[in-house]
Amino acid sequence: MTAFSKRTSKQTKQTLQPLFLNASAVLGLVAVPCAMGGRHPIGYLFLTAAALVAVLGWIARVASMPRQQYRIGIAEALFACGLLIGCVQLVPLSPTLLSLISPRLSAWFPFLNEMPTSAAGLGGWNRVSVVPGETLRGLGIFLSQGILVTIFAQRAGHTNEIHRLLNVIVFATGILATIGIAQYLAGNGKYLWFYDFLYNDASGVVKGTFTNRNHFASFLALGWGAVGWFTFCTSSNGRPVHQTGRVAKHFSTTQNVYAAGSLRTVSGFLLLAMVTFAGALSLSRGGILAIATAALVSLISFKCIGVIGWRSTLAIGCTAALVVSALFIHGLDQVSGRLDDFFDETHFANGFGRLDVWKAACSAVTDFPILGTGIGSHAEVSPIYMPATNGIVFTHAENSYLNLAVETGLVGLFLGGIGIVAAIVATVILLRKGTHEEKLIATAFGAALAAGGVHAATDFIWYVPACSTLLFLAGATMISLASRRCALLPACTFELDRISASIAGMFLLVVLGATGFQQFRSAFAQPHWETAVRDNASLAAIAFAPPEKSSTADDNSDADDSTASITNILPAESIDPEVGKAIDTLSRMISSLEQVLLFRPDHPHAWSTLAIARLERFGLRRRASGFRATLCDLEQAALASEFSSRESFELWLRETLGDDVDELVRARHDALESVDNNPLSGEAWCVLARLSFLFSPDPERARHLIDQACVVRPHNGQVLFEAGNAALINGDTERAWSLWRQSFAASRSQRQMVLRALLHAVPASEVCRLLSPDLDGLRAIDVMWSFRSTPEEMRDVRQQRLLAVQKQLELFESMDRVKAPPLRLEAASLQKRLGDIDAAAATLEMALNMDPGLFDPHRMLIDVAMDRHDWTTARREVEWCLMRRPESSSLKILLTKAVLAASHNENSLENTSPQR
């Protein structure tokens, strides 16, 4: 090979790395955010692909040099320590070592650890992580981020590389803001106009392609400093155009230089306005605060550096005016309303969930202070410490620092703190000692660090790959760049030859390939999981249908009573015409779950959901075949028979159930797999308890399994309901009522299950005495029992409900005047149904005095006035309502009735008046 060809080959290889780095930056900072902020398996796959492309670029560079120097600094060491923590959490440990690291685990799994042969057929738990599948997935994400960030940090000594990275960040921030605004103004409720996300939609607020508005606003805040750099530093080397002459070489005239710089500046200011506007319309309080922090830090720093003059100050004022004007046109009231919550005591005193989540997180850290409970485990751990949450799952601790401490312990929090402090120190060093270009870069990334640090105090943005990747890139770049300027941030330098570096690169490719393959499988599993969840929702629509109205029911229980907004729920087994449809839906759901587990066998919830679905299908199939005996009846018969051998029991079971026994065996297998992958699955422990008689005649086994379920899910309504059923079977009525009372209070959906069990056996007044319901519970009892009870039988319940409403009114009138009118309407409706017409009229008049423009009180006052034969008031109110709804035929009928009644009343008075 000639010298020229060798030189050409070397130059080609050297030019490949920038191309690979640019491609990896686009994948990591544009594609990942577009995949639901990276919280979708496809987003994980994009992140791994970004790391893989970066490694390919590194290998291309290695191939062009016989030897190359590498710097290992604080950032690289912290990434290595983080990976080590994740590995330790996954490795099986001896009982002695595990008890030292996580002593609380023995209290969580008393029957799993102390009864390895009798509880569930499993041995004791031997890992720090309580959800190994989630920890492994989180470790794969962190590995991809670490490799990607490390490769970029190695190139931090070249400012051109950093400028390219900043330009990609600017592009990503701008494109996400544009998508968010366009989707908000002209969207169809789907993400990117085609993806129907399972848990929420894209309407209501600006959230772009993120699943949560807080995450979207956080990403914009992290990119605000880069957009500021793009705006105020209008040349390729980071200097304003008027401060450099080198750029003029690329243009024919000086005027072209200034024209290009002016175009970039104008574009930058428009981009700043759009990003700020999108962040404000996200209505994320923490996100708006983070954007304000980034803007403040950026502008002050740019001013101190000297790139903001009087023209730029004027342009900043115009940009702010543009944003405010846009908000005046659309969204200012919503934004100001959200920001008012920062200073509203009632927001914190009246159901502000973050306080409870933070307390629960602190309790978890106290119990697991060393290495935590495992990466990605917060969603499974928090229900142990949280009070009843009405079915809401808190996937994170609403605070990045607390969440990190819960999942990785104080060790992980300490490492994270070192990284934050090191990044801040590095930024300060560059702002004081760096070159002009380095100061501008430090401002852009320093604003991201400040915004991320502020927002992290009110939300866990670090588990969103799009946000955490950008934050890691900012911190690692600052540390790497500052380590070349100051010995305070040491870095170890070593050399690798071409062969060793290539081997290391190939090893990373293999690891990333394996990680990407698992994420690829997860991406295939996700649609099946979403289908299963939607089928489950359709089953709920079948199961939660209202009961048929009894002939003795209260005809005034009012289908149009807007205050009785509780959902009428009954299990599917009570609706015979729908049993076949429910069985078909369950079969489709089971098929989807089997596909999920085929691609992702470590899914934390699919196994338990599959086990429950099999049990439900078993019961419905038996019911459809005409068998009325329940699984509980079958268990009692099996235990009472006292079979002499296992073979005789299996023969009896096969004769009794036929092929349906296979469904129960598969359900037990699925439940065992569930507790093996996620021992905090209370529902799986309940399934094992229900089916324990299949493998042991000892009733104590079922009791132990139910107790285990209550330990790991002490406030789960379904678990408490099953525990109450088990207590009733065992003859402990007092404990059964206590557990049902807790289940009733746990969630709205569980209330219906408890009430359905009591509907045909216990009067409504006795249910109120036994369950001690709150206002929502009284509403549910009123609605359900009204279908089968007389008004007199419901009188006591409605009086209790009225007292509860009045007590709520006393609270809301002083704290939340917005919620007071609906409560007054509910009180008036109850007073009317109780026969106290005068009190109902007075309540409605009071509601109208507070807000005369409300339609519903006027509409109800018509009925009340007619009941009182106050035809003048009735006519006045009907005419008022008709002015607002002139097309209403029912109001026209009422007007005719009121006029005729008033006329008849006047004629009667004339006929009865004395003659003169």
Regions found by a protein language model. Give the residues of each.
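Transmembrane helices and adjacent periplasmic/lumenal helix-loop junctions
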Residues: 40-41, 281-289, 460, 713-717, ...
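TM-adjacent membrane-interface loops and short helices in multi-pass inner/ER membrane proteins
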Residues: 89, 212, 355-394, 401-404, ...
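Terminal, low-structured helical/coil segments at or just beyond the last alpha-helical repeat
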Residues: 767-784, 808-811, 818, 875-916
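Short extracytoplasmic/periplasmic juxtamembrane "stem" segments immediately C-terminal to an N-terminal membrane anchor
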Residues: 107-114, 199-203, 342-355, 528-546, ...
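Alpha-helical transmembrane segments of multi-pass inner-membrane proteins
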Residues: 2-36, 45-60, 83-93, 115-119, ...
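Extracytosolic (periplasmic/ER-lumenal) interhelical loops and adjacent juxtamembrane/interface segments
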Residues: 96-128, 196-197, 364, 376, ...
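Hydrophobic alpha-helical transmembrane segments in integral membrane proteins
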Residues: 329-341, 496-546
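Soluble catalytic regions of membrane-associated enzymes that act on cell-envelope
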Residues: 385, 390-392, 520-802, 813-833, ...
